[in-house]
Amino acid sequence: MDQNGMEIPVTLIIKAPNQKYSDQTISCFLNWTVGKLKTHLSNVYPSKPLTKDQRLVYSGRLLPDHLQLKDILRKQDEYHMVHLVCTSRTPPSSPKSSTNRESHEALASNSNSSSDQSGSSTPSSSQETLTLATSSSSEGLRQRTLPQAQTDPAQSHQVPYVMQGNVDNQLPGQAVPAGFPVYPAFNPLQMLWWQQMYAHQYYMQYQAAVSAQATSNANPAQPAATQPLNLAHVPGEEPPPAPNLVAQENRPMNENVQMNAQGGPVLNEEDFNRDWLDWMYTFSRAAILLSIVYFYSSFSRFIMVMGAMLLVYLHQAGWFPFRQEGVQHQAPNNNAEVNNDVQNANNLELEEMERLMDDGLEDESGEDAGEDASAIQRPGLMASAWSFITTFFTSLIPEGPPQVAN
């Protein structure tokens, strides 16, 4: 490009990082050097900064004085953004300095006139006037120290303030006691309340399990369930047993009772309200299974499988119960002993629960597993073989969808 082309003016936008002055638009030429631009800014810029104190930054790069603008500026940009940074030796003067100086002189003259008229002014009043003048001259600056921290440090240590956002936004009314953390964790009372709630829920679940086990063993569940709640029970005032306890003991109990979440057995409405589509689906599955057995085996095997499936179905329906019910047949004269044993067992279990809660409920799972293992009798060889066979043939029979608890 020739010399005439270098005389084309270029528009620069000078920005101040402290936002003290607005953006200044400067017109210059491409053949200017950075040093010449600084000299021009020292005459044109509002703060009149010295050339040696100026630092020009363009596109994140510090511009040295010997470079020309044609080697730095991008040709495709119409406006070029340049940041002007000045050192602290010659800070830019504030445009409000004259008004602050006038207000300071007015306050000083007022203080002098008031002191001359009174003639007995104290040093504290003059100090307060100077403090007001100093605060008015330092308008716009942020206070980063507490006013009471310098005057009374002991009081500031005794009553710590809660920090909210800036240091300027401290509220003296939001004080906390000494020695208490500013952001405390859970209160000890809250921790004790949570532990009590956990122990209560665990105790309720344990009582539900004990009552269900007592119901399955055909014990008088209604008197036994109310014994743990009656802590003020006197042994000599025990009511006589009801006459229908013998009939309840001799009555066979259904051990496979599904419990509802709200209490009580689950009513399987799907067993009573099964539509024709459900029945067709069940019969189709059974027909497919029997057809596979019939076409891929002999007639004798087909009859054997049909008989086994029929026996398993009748067993599931309750026609052939194989469970021993010797525990259910007890003498009527042992009702009082059974009630006392159940009461003593419940009291021992309640004491065990209190001991576990005092220990922190650390080894609850191990103890429960040990008690369950000792309470359950080991099945014999014939019972294991029968369970294996029934489980195998039961898996071959199609069943309906699983029941969903409420």
UniProtKB/Swiss-Prot annotation:
PROSITE patterns in alphabetical order: UBIQUITIN_2
Gene Ontology annotations of biological process type: endoplasmic reticulum unfolded protein response; spermatogenesis
The keyword Membrane belongs to this UniProt entry's keyword annotation: yes
Compositional bias annotation for Low complexity: 87-98, 109-139
Region (Disordered): 86-156
Pfam families: ubiquitin (PF00240)
One GO cellular component, as annotated: membrane
Biased composition range(s): Polar residues: 145-156
Keyword Membrane: yes
Sequence ranges assigned to domain Ubiquitin-like in this UniProt record: 10-89
Annotated localization: Membrane
Transmembrane stretches, start-end: 302-322
Keyword terms of this UniProt record: Membrane, Transmembrane, Transmembrane helix, Unfolded protein response
Topological type in the membrane: Single-pass membrane protein
SS bond list: none
Functional note: Could be involved in the unfolded protein response (UPR) pathway.
Protein name as catalogued: Homocysteine-responsive endoplasmic reticulum-resident ubiquitin-like domain member 2 protein
Organism: Bos taurus
Lineage, broadest ranks: Eukaryota, Metazoa, Chordata, Craniata, Vertebrata
